[in-house]
Amino acid sequence: MKKIILYSAVLLGALQLHAQKPQKIKPVKKFDTKVAEPSDIALNAAKDGFWIVGDGGVLYEVNLDGTIRRQADYQGLDCEGVYAEGKYVYVAEELSRKIKVFDAATLKVARTVTVPYNGARNKGYEGIAFNKTNDRFVVVVEKSPINIFELDKDFKIVNEINLGNIAKDVSAITYYNNSIWLLSDESMMVFRLNPADYTVTGSWKLPILNPEGLTFDAEGNMIVLSDDMQTIYSFTNPEKQQ
């Protein structure tokens, strides 16, 4: 397995991060959801709703206002990340190190893949996305250390990036507008990264308690999901607020 640790990228990103004070941004809308302990959120293929996973291990499809549309029969184990593209929905389980691939039409599990990681059981994969720049899936480890693993189309690890002390933790990852975006629960921040080398290109401070999920809607608004508050927050795209 080819593995590249981009320490120079991490150092440069850290210098960029500390050189600029993060801009504070505020949500413009919010919607409550009945999904218990929600952990991550992704826009569905029709762009008329979201996929949400939670600590209870269930995959939900919700409307844009957070009301539950349907849910999968499958009961997973500590689902922390969700990504959707085309006919499939990809769910990352933290404790088991498994990625479940669901058929979006039937909500049945079409494939299960184990992606090994030797870290602590409760410090595993917190998010999953697809890096369109590098044409690879990416999963992110919460902390100790904060790592991004790039995966090929068969979910084999082909690259590992150590993000150093970018934040206290990372709770979600997504790809939007040719950038990788990371969310930190403990730091209450969102970061924009160069998708080619994962250097930090922007950071923003959020007034959200326990932010766990991150995506963008069809209009380009940034969507943040709060676990404790069971609330979906909508922000004007941070790139338009610079």
Model regions: which residues?
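Short coil/turn segments that connect the beta-strands within blades of beta-propeller domains
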Residues: 46-48, 86-87, 133-135, 177-178, ...
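Short loop/turn segments that connect beta-strands within beta-propeller blades
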Residues: 63-67, 103-107, 152-155, 194-198, ...
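Conserved blade-ending motifs and adjacent loop-strand segments that build the rim/top face
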Residues: 202-215
